[in-house]
Amino acid sequence: LHARSSLAPERAFYFLKTVKESPVPFAEWSAYTVSFHESESVEVMQFILRILRDLLLLRVGVSIEKIQLKRYASELSAIVLQWPEDEIQQGIKAVEEGLEGVSRYVNIHLIWDYICLTFLQGRGLY
């Protein structure tokens, strides 16, 4: 793994915290990602997907021992109740579509806008 990979988990958890708790989530996330290279964005999106899939498993009652990101069990346990199943599923769909957009050479900032706005709709902000 190259050096940037180690930032993906931290950035992914920061994304979820931002879209859930920030008073200005869209502006905050847009400013945070402005200097990301496309490869960094893809790594963060992939990690967000992994987090969301594990959160979904936890929401439906799967034990913490069976999740993929065991290393982040405490972080996942701390946020799982903030994320209803429907928001998680919406988020998974948005990130998967975002990654599809990357493969079709859509501008990465537009993809982040789409993902962020989808999460904010789940929060009831848009």
List PLM regions with ranges.
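Charged, glycine-rich active-site and insertion segments that engage polyanionic ligands
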Residues: 1-47, 51-126
